[in-house]
Amino acid sequence: MNTNSKEVLSLGVQVPEAWEELLTMKVEAKSHLQWQESRLKRSNPLAREIFRRHFRQLCYQETPGPREALTRLQELCYQWLRPHVSTKEQILDLLVLEQFLSILPKELQGWVREHCPESGEEAVILLEDLERELDEPQHEMVAHRHRQEVLCKEMVPLAEQTPLTLQSQPKEPQLTCDSAQKCHSIGETDEVTKTEDRELVLRKDCPKIVEPHGKMFNEQTWEVSQQDPSHGEVGEHKDRIERQWGNLLGEGQHKCDECGKSFTQSSGLIRHQRIHTGERPYECNECGKAFSRSSGLFNHRGIHNIQKRYHCKECGKVFSQSAGLIQHQRIHKGEKPYQCSQCSKSYSRRSFLIEHQRSHTGERPHQCIECGKSFNRHCNLIRHQKIHTVAELV
């Protein structure tokens, strides 16, 4: 045997080992890549939203034929709902969430989808926070307007009963020393504050007022005269009225640069801006989920409180529903109430019995989307899908 034959023979012996090593490296690399991809999909709700859109928007004309269209829909639905890692309740919640978003107005649909809620409860919390953001300025505006209307109603009847302007009485000043003393005596009664308050508001509307000695003075002179200690209560009430009117006139001074919405208080603007920035400073200590408002965190904590109601006394495991606790306790007690009518085998859970009965009926509900092969157990399908993964690498 010549040298070339020996080299070929030696290569023939070494090639399978090198090929096996290369194949192992490829399988490990792809497994790591799939693990990273699945981790990204689990941690990123936006990925599930993309799969949902593809699932809903797939056109028959985009596929080569009916089988390919059905297979593609199965793949997208599988990636969207993730039945291998999601419970029935979670899948049901996703379907309800989709229908809930579809009945919302289009403007709210887009806004809620941008925040990528993972459940219907999260979508409701987002909408409730948004409603509170929108209602706060309107509520304050209504309160100010109500105070303004009450103030005007008190001013109008008093102005009709006691005219004090020069036009109504140009030549005969009515405010004498006797009348001033009378007013002073009235001021000692329980109604003094209310009467003086109305006179003060009325005088603000009058350009000039008659003084006891017939001297005319304007609003500035009146304000100086109110500095007298005997009129302290009137001046204090006047300041309070001016502050209320100042708040009304200054309404909307805090404006959002993004959408132009105005708020009376800076705290309202700060809460509103979190909608645009996506900031969520309130974080749950249990699961790490964050919220833009404290009310959202408060409502979310109720979920954890509900989830921790049912404790197993044997091992300390926690369940959100009593049925889950009852099923779990059968493990400790050894109870197997579900019995197969074919072979009399017993199981602690009904799902185990259903899975066992497929061995008698021949039912295979778990189908591979790659080749169409069916299996009676989901674990067998997962084991089978590894064959396709290795084939793709080769």
Curated annotation (Swiss-Prot):
It is found in: Nucleus. Residues 52-134 form the SCAN box domain. Pfam families: SCAN, zf-C2H2. One of its GO terms (cellular component) is nucleus. There is a cross-link at residues 26, 215, 238 (Glycyl lysine isopeptide (Lys-Gly) (interchain with G-Cter in SUMO2)). GO terms for molecular function: DNA-binding transcription factor activity, RNA polymerase II-specific; RNA polymerase II cis-regulatory region sequence-specific DNA binding; sequence-specific double-stranded DNA binding; zinc ion binding. A zinc finger (C2H2-type) spans 254-276, 282-304, 310-332, 338-360, 366-388. Keywords: DNA-binding, Isopeptide bond, Metal-binding, Nucleus, Repeat, Transcription, Transcription regulation, Ubl conjugation, Zinc, Zinc-finger. InterPro entries: SCAN_dom (IPR003309), SCAN_sf (IPR038269), Znf_C2H2_sf (IPR036236), Znf_C2H2_type (IPR013087). One of its GO terms (biological process) is regulation of transcription by RNA polymerase II. Belongs to the krueppel C2H2-type zinc-finger protein family. May be involved in transcriptional regulation. This is Zinc finger and SCAN domain-containing protein 9. It comes from Homo sapiens (Human). The lineage of its organism: Eukaryota, Metazoa, Chordata, Craniata, Vertebrata.
